[in-house]
């Protein structure tokens, strides 16, 4: 093999000429062990808690959660099959963040903010950290504007205000998601207008659900024209636990963008029980000490720091709001389990859905006796307060009397009247799915129920009475509905008009 000196010197000269003094320094570690979505890493001495790390060989990212003396425990945001012992791990020097802004509306994304709907890349210029501190006391204002769910039983008895956290709790298959989806659909009219203060942008976070279920929900939103003002964040049942844990925080960061820009957001977490289970799995695999029901000690903090980010801000901070509707699934109506009691104590009220009511055909299956809204009544519009004040007491009396009436003893006339009224009001509060009602329609219908217009018609005809009354109002008395909507109160003139409409209608109803 002949060695040409000229060639060698030319190569050396070019290498010397191209030699740069700058050197890239990166903090690198090695994988000690990996499995179940958790990696133990040696090295990375300067990594921060909650910092993103990268596994370049496998092309996935993770987050450092446990900083121990001799190793770092990291959760992996993706499949861990491609990661092997001894693989290189790099610090990214950043905390988990996601894209935010209007560009996400109408899109379906994963918890890292990457699109999964096949509609191309997300158009967004701004990114936000997923886990930030909730607003303090000074920037906040008390809840005073309503969130209209479009469901009579909720808007009349358990009203929700903008900036509130209202828990939806019940067993599986009791219609929890249906209540949340109807609330999104009911915002269509407000979001179609030009008044930004009336609009409510929605974020739906699906945690640990079947992909087919999520696809059906997205299809429903699309068919009803509601997807255009909604962001859907999905961590399905087949995703690793760290992504199911991250999804609510990602959705919240997207919703907070609306709140902090003087707009109004609504976020639905469906459901937080599955996030708690995912967090329990991660914590146990990271060898953190278990507590009650094997959940880690900070599972309360997990939910409180998430739900405290829903707030109504004052004028100095843009008057924006973020309303949260967390969903919790119970086992056999047991609301005294660990996670349900935690979330009940964090939220500003709860809507209880019961299996028994659901199978009796009372849908939405809201138990109005034990459901409460701690701050929503101050957000209710005056017209609704005027007509719904009586219904609460009457339904409470009806439930008490109905329990005694089971014994079959002879009932006096006043008790029979009370039972008859209660039956009709219960029937009146029933509502089919995907058929939310505008607040002015609800006011007219509830007025008819509480003022005795239904007392003389059979219970089976209540639904027909309602639909025909609304048809009459829309065809002949549109101005009455418009006035209730704009004035938000029933003054003497409006009440007299409504009375005469109802008198004429009930005289002809048969």
From Swiss-Prot:
Instruction: Give an example GO cellular component term for this record.
Output: plasma membrane
What does the record say about its membrane topology? Peripheral membrane protein
User: GO molecular function terms here?
Assistant: ADP binding; ATP binding; proton-transporting ATP synthase activity, rotational mechanism
**Cell compartments where the protein resides:** Cell inner membrane
Species for this entry? Caulobacter sp. (strain K31)
What is this protein's name?
A: ATP synthase subunit alpha
InterPro entries hit by this protein: ATP_synth_asu-like_sf (IPR023366), ATP_synth_asu_C (IPR000793), ATP_synth_asu_C_sf (IPR038376), ATP_synth_F1_a_nt-bd_dom (IPR033732), ATP_synth_F1_asu (IPR005294), ATPase_a/bsu_AS (IPR020003), ATPase_F1/V1/A1_a/bsu_N (IPR004100), ATPase_F1/V1/A1_a/bsu_N_sf (IPR036121)
- Gene3D superfamilies named in the record: 2.40.30.20, ATP synthase alpha/beta chain, C-terminal domain, P-loop containing nucleotide triphosphate hydrolases
Positions binding ATP in this chain are 170-177
PROSITE patterns documented for this protein: ATPASE_ALPHA_BETA
Q: How does it assemble?
A: F-type ATPases have 2 components, CF(1) - the catalytic core - and CF(0) - the membrane proton channel. CF(1) has five subunits: alpha(3), beta(3), gamma(1), delta(1), epsilon(1). CF(0) has three main subunits: a(1), b(2) and c(9-12). The alpha and beta chains form an alternating ring which encloses part of the gamma chain. CF(1) is attached to CF(0) by a central stalk formed by the gamma and epsilon chains, while a peripheral stalk is formed by the delta and b chains.
Q: What is the enzyme's class at the highest EC level?
A: translocase
What HAMAP family has UniProt attached to this entry? ATP_synth_alpha_bact
Q: What is its EC number?
A: 7.1.2.2
* Biological role: Produces ATP from ADP in the presence of a proton gradient across the membrane. The alpha chain is a regulatory subunit.
Give the protein family.
Answer: Belongs to the ATPase alpha/beta chains family.
List the keywords (alphabetical): ATP synthesis, ATP-binding, Cell inner membrane, Cell membrane, CF(1), Hydrogen ion transport, Ion transport, Membrane, Nucleotide-binding, Translocase, Transport
Looking at the record's lineage, which domain of life comes first? Bacteria
Catalysed reaction equations from the record? ATP + H2O + 4 H(+)(in) = ADP + phosphate + 5 H(+)(out)
Q: Give site residues, Required for activity.
A: 371
